[in-house]
Amino acid sequence: MEHSTEILYNKTEVYCSAVHRFGSDALLLARFCEPKRSQTAADLCSGCGIVSLEWHDRGHRGPCAAVELQPEASALLQQAVAEQGIGHITPHLADLRSFREGEGQFDVCACNPPYFAAGPQSAKAGRATARHETDCTLEDVCACGFRLLKDGGRLALCHRPCLLYTSPSP
């Protein structure tokens, strides 16, 4: 598979494609909710695996499940972890709406979900899936996090600020 390589601070390589790449929001999310060295972690809507790989680059060595719906994106992460011998990150080609592996066992779940519920979509299917709620909604992400997290676990999302406002009840 044709890809470009981005190198993180401590030399971990992230494989990207024209459709599956990452932005600063994913790096900020990874740093915001960074798991402790041996904690169990899940990277939902993992794309090319930037959150999981950033955690690894910064010292996380606990089990990490990276759940991604799109085969090309999941394959990029699979290739990156295989070629670099990163055994604690397990890419899962799966729909988070039905993902159940490790239920109730995770300390940290992170997700940089699709941001847009409506509006014009890219003609490229992969880009549309990554940016628009075509295959999962914010509610789906929260439900998956709830299933996977242990008591006291943390779910961290990077989302549009306008969705944080809820009008007061009358």
Predicted feature residues:
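Conserved beta-strand signature within the Rossmann-like core of class I S-adenosyl-L-methionine
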Residues: 153-158
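Mobile active-site "lid"/loop adjacent to the S-adenosyl-L-methionine
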Residues: 113-140
